[in-house]
Amino acid sequence: LDNIVLNIKNLSFYYKKDSPIYSDFNLVLQKGELVSIFGKSGSGKTTLFELILGNLKSQNGTIEKSKISMIFQDPFNSFHPTYTIYEQISDVVQRDFKEELDKVLPKLNLDLEILYKKSYELSGGQLQRCSILRAVLQKPDLLLVDEPTSALDNIVAYDVMKLLITLLKDCAILLVTHDINMAKWCSNRIIRLKDADK
């Protein structure tokens, strides 16, 4: 039981009563597991994340979760343009992590100088790696990953997932994707969602 980082029981959610997005949905995630939520646009993938994060309230069921971090779909929306990457990571991590950077930055193909830049000065790939860095330094039990590769080309996309798996091997990862090949390649389990709201 100590290994369980996400436990969703009998979850029901709808925007319209006659079109449930989830009906008695159950999901258990353990440390080290990577589970992909696969489905088309409108099938409820992002809704599930909003429910887990507490941004939406379900009509029924319970969600028990451990410490969460998230990597967003658009790397350019992951950081505020007014502050440096370093300032924003510090604000979230809230501890001295300078020593950890020596180990993690080379694995992400980042250097310290990049962290003192602002988001508009960096490429999408660099920002996505900065998002991974932030997640790694947060040391979450559960990482929510929302289509992290959609803005990247195929080779870079797989590199990003390899980095996540390598650097967060003890963390459970819940990946939302519309790329079935990506899901098959990296997942322990795949959950297919139907177009519930269509």
Model-found features: residue ranges?
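Q-loop/switch helix immediately C-terminal to the Walker
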Residues: 74, 81-97
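The feature captures the beta-strand-to-loop junction immediately N-terminal to the Walker
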Residues: 38-40
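Helix-to-loop junction immediately C-terminal to a conserved catalytic motif
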Residues: 53
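Conserved ABC ATPase signature
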Residues: 118-122, 126
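Catalytic Walker B motif of ABC-type/P-loop ATPase nucleotide-binding domains
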Residues: 143-147
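A short, proline-enriched helix->beta-strand linker immediately N-terminal to the Walker B motif
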Residues: 137-141
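Hydrophobic anchor residue at the start of the ABC signature
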Residues: 132, 160
